[in-house]
């Protein structure tokens, strides 16, 4: 009985430590997001923070390695430079830029590197207003070809969904931009690496849209993606745990 109680205490301590690590990881992601939003506020107001972009900073991140606090997947559009719109400096954010902010295995590999190997607690999927890639997809007739066609194919589902919802041309464009961001989120969540980090509470994912007109970044509501453990799997795991506990009690 004494050993059984001791095992129970150890298990309780383990649960507390695990929960504490999840809370810490969650707060790290929240803090990283707040840093981005604070930076965007400075950008919009034109009150930029002083940044060391000289020799000392370059030497620091060369010798000490990179330690960015966020990974961002954004569009290649020259009007959407994440470092500027979030008022960040050298080594602050790990960025993956692709036209239309879509992802393929190569882009996903870069994202995985940022969240798993560079250990950023935050991943932001950033779309933007008046996106040329989405516009081009809306105007495409027939089967898209070539390398640009590969981008168009990734965006087409969002455009089709937006057209079904209806509205003016501008409204359809804006809806398609948001739908595309959500589709990218779903694609990112197919990554086993990303899924595991989210499940373990080590990674926070957010989706957002940058407004080219006013410079503001608007946070969007995440869609529900089934990345959690299936209920049947969860029940099986619970049963296995209970059996293991009973065997331990009998042994003692």
Language-model features: where?
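Catalytic core of membrane glycerolipid acyltransferases/transacylases, capturing the structured
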Residues: 79-96
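Divalent-metal-activated hydrolytic enzyme cores
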Residues: 25-65, 90-91, 101-119, 132-252
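Bacterial N-terminal signal peptides that target proteins for export
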Residues: 1-11
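Bacterial N-terminal signal peptides
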Residues: 9-21
């Amino acid at each position: 009985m004494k050993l059984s109680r001791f095992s129970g205490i150890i298990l309780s301590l383990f649960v507390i430590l695990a929960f504490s690590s999840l809370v810490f990881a969650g707060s790290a992601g929240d803090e990283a997001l707040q840093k981005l939003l604070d930076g965007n506020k400075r950008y919009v107001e034109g009150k930029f923070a002083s940044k060391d972009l000289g020799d000392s900073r370059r030497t620091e991140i060369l010798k000490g390695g990179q330690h960015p606090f966020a990974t961002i997947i954004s569009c290649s559009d020259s009007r959407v430079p994440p470092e500027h719109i979030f008022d960040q400096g050298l080594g602050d954010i790990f960025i993956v830029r692709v036209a239309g902010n879509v992802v393929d295995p190569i882009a996903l590999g870069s994202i995985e590197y940022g969240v798993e190997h560079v250990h950023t607690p935050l991943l932001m999927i950033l779309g933007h207003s008046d996106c040329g890639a989405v516009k081009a997809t809306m105007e495409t007739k027939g089967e898209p070809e070539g390398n640009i066609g590969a981008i168009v194919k990734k965006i087409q589902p969002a455009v089709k969904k937006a057209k079904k919802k209806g509205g003016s041309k501008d409204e359809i464009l804006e809806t398609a931009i948001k739908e595309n961001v959500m589709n990218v989120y779903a694609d990112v969540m197919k990554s086993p690496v990303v899924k595991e980090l989210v499940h373990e509470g080590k990674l926070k994912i957010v989706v957002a849209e940058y407004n080219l007109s006013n410079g503001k970044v608007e946070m969007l509501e995440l869609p529900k993606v089934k990345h959690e453990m299936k209920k049947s799997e969860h029940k099986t795991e619970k049963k296995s745990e209970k059996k293991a506990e009973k065997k331990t009690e009998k042994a003692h």
